[in-house]
Amino acid sequence: MVLVSETPSSAHLRWAYMDHWRVETPQGPVSQYTSVAHFDRFLKQIAAVGFEAIETFDFHLGVLRELFGSLEKCRDFMQERGVERVLSLFHAVMYDERQSMPHVPATHDRMFNYARYIMESSRGLGVENFIVMPAGLYYDVEPVTDEKIRACADLWNRIGQMTQDYGIRTCCHHEFFCGIRSAAEIEKFYEWTDPRYVFFYCDTAQHVIAGVDPVELYRKLHARCGGFHFKDTQNVDRTEDYRRRPDAEIMAPTTPRWFWEMGAPQGLVDFPALARAMKQCGYRGWVSVEHDKADVGAGNYPESTALAAWYRKHVFERIYA
């Protein structure tokens, strides 16, 4: 992201795809990481609708190395199909106060060392962002206190400084069930983190579900915005589903499907307002499209991806241009 004085145009945005992809087969849902052939078809489909990079979880690093022999060869394979890089790795650490919990300082050394291991393990893919949930699950953190938020800030300042040595930004992504979820908690967290080392990753649907306006939040934090996850939702959590164990996204009895592709009917994210805000604030760079659990209720990932790409091209980019 670069702040500039001249007016941006849609040519200043590049589009990435945050990977939750699965396809239905007679054997059930199949991931693209099961074979080179599946990965090939996945890359060609997303490239065909205008995505130039992917984001994925860091636990896929070993699989990609096994499929292609090295991450450099994997990136060559991707580029031959029109996908430039793995833009971001989402850190899939299992938060546990015994060994990895951001608000527990005794676990910080282990978390730091694991993050450094991911940095070393990801060389060759062109990664630019290390995306993290900055606190544990809400029910593991509550009551959320200033002391706990400061402890989280201390950890990510330390890790963020280290990832800069690898040319990678540490970006914080606030799920609606995260221990740092409200506007007040988020404001404190970014006040107590170093803007040189810790960046904000704006997930539009997650903030809406948590009762936070992502457009207003982006305007406040635009100078620290490392990127976006564009997805929509039709629901705000009004019954404290964020406290559901073990996974609020799948255990909430009120909401069978939290996430939808941008432009979906009854969507609550104001993407036109966000496009105007990004234009006014001079945002340039990568934007990621995501549709987590798109296959709930007989949906599918290829369809959601194509619908989001249509909205991106025919609605969002025309406003931003």
Summary of predicted features, one role per range:
Residues 1-127, 147, 157, 195, ...:
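N-terminal pre-domain/capping segments
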Residues 139-156, 162:
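Active-site cleft segment of glycoside hydrolase catalytic domains centered on the general acid/base Glu
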Residues 16-20, 55-57, 86-91, 130-134, ...:
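A cross-family glycoside hydrolase active-site/sugar-binding cleft signature
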Residues 265-280:
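A short, acidic, amphipathic alpha-helical segment used as a generic capping/interface helix at domain edges
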Residues 31-36, 57-71, 94-99, 109-111, ...:
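Acidic-and-aromatic substrate-binding clefts and catalytic sites of carbohydrate-active enzymes
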Residues 118-143, 166-175, 288-289:
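Active-site groove signature of glycoside hydrolases
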Residues 80-82, 125, 165-166, 196, ...:
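Helix C-cap/helix->beta junction micro-motif
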Residues 8-12, 21, 27-29, 53-54, ...:
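Acidic/histidine-rich catalytic cores of soluble enzymes
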